[in-house]
Amino acid sequence: MLTKGVRALAWSPRRYITLDAEAAKPVVAKRRRMTEFTDKLNKGPSFEDFLTGKAAQMTLDPLEEARQNAEESKKLPAWLKVPIPKGKNFHKLKEDVRDLKLSTVCEEAKCPNIGECWGGNKGSATATIMLLGDTCTRGCRFCSVKTNRTPAKPDPKEPENTAEAISRWGLGYVVLTMVDRDDLPDGGAHHLAETVQRIKQKAPHILVETLAGDFRGNLEMVDVMARSGLDVYAHNVETVEALTPHVRDRRATYQQSLSVLKRAKQTVPTLVTKTSIMLGMGETDEQVLQTMKDLRAVDCDVVTFGQYMRPTRRHMKVVEYVKPEKFDYWKEKALELGFLYCASGPLVRSSYKAGEAYIENVLRNRRQA
């Protein structure tokens, strides 16, 4: 009996362990299938593709996707095709950005002008530094910047590293931008303001433009930025009011953007205020004209117009490739309405250097007056 009992005790654990392992297999397999399904879903067609009936035509094959992207690029109008970035200055600036662990909107947003801006000589090369990391808390449908609800904490060395990089490049005008940081109490305003101040300490002659977020409508943070010592306060409305809910993250509203531009000018009247509008998203001429009037009503000084370019097939589609002649038309209208300056063209972006050269002259003349 004792031997039998011992055998039973020795056998029972093995039996239960075997049963537990077998029972776990379906669970592990199910989790694996769910993970694979989630990955496929993330890489698959967008909701817009289902609405337009094109989801069935899509594939998850990376090679096929690359082929389709190549075919799509062939359809671009000639005026939207640019040469591949290259040159000594381009690679030197790129190395500096890497060495100092900085992010640039030029790369993150896949700007088509990166070769022209980074490839210029020492006096004209321009890079738009993106502060507060490379991950945004918002998900606008036109933007290719990475998104996450809880990005990494801001790098406390970033303001100093940014100022050091800019002093290396010997620029006379620099653009700072930021990802939206709704996870931070101040939206990142003090971090951005500190960067401006560090730059001014190292090189007082440099003119600084900041392309800031809306800080979720917290106008006190707009005051912090406006008083930081910057020269140009830029904040983009991006599109017309009617398309804003479709184009931008739900936390970004048209009226909120107007209030940011208005408050910046009220806080420091000598600031140049600036905004940018993308065309080709389905807007009408009447809507664009009204947007320009709304901007002038809040005393916005500078406006730029550029063609919306779809970063990837997961972003919203281009409704229209606007012809260069139309961009010329909007430039004329902007000047008629009283804007200080307007850069308008298919490849123009909010920090495009052509506009900076003009604004730089205006600001330096104001300093001398």
Curated annotation (Swiss-Prot):
Ranges for domain Radical SAM core: 121-340
Listed InterPro entries: Aldolase_TIM, Elp3/MiaA/NifB-like_rSAM, LIAS_N, Lipoyl_synth, rSAM
Root EC class: transferase
SMART domains documented for this protein: Elp3
PROSITE patterns: RADICAL_SAM
Associated pathway: Protein modification; protein lipoylation via endogenous pathway; protein N(6)-(lipoyl)lysine from octanoyl-[acyl-carrier-protein]: step 2/2
Record: residues binding [4Fe-4S] cluster 2: C136, C140, C143
Signal peptide extent: none
Listed NCBIfam families: lipA (TIGR00510), PRK05481.1 (NF004019), PRK12928.1 (NF009544)
Record's protein name: Lipoyl synthase, mitochondrial
Species: Eremothecium gossypii (strain ATCC 10895 / CBS 109.51 / FGSC 9923 / NRRL Y-1056) (Yeast)
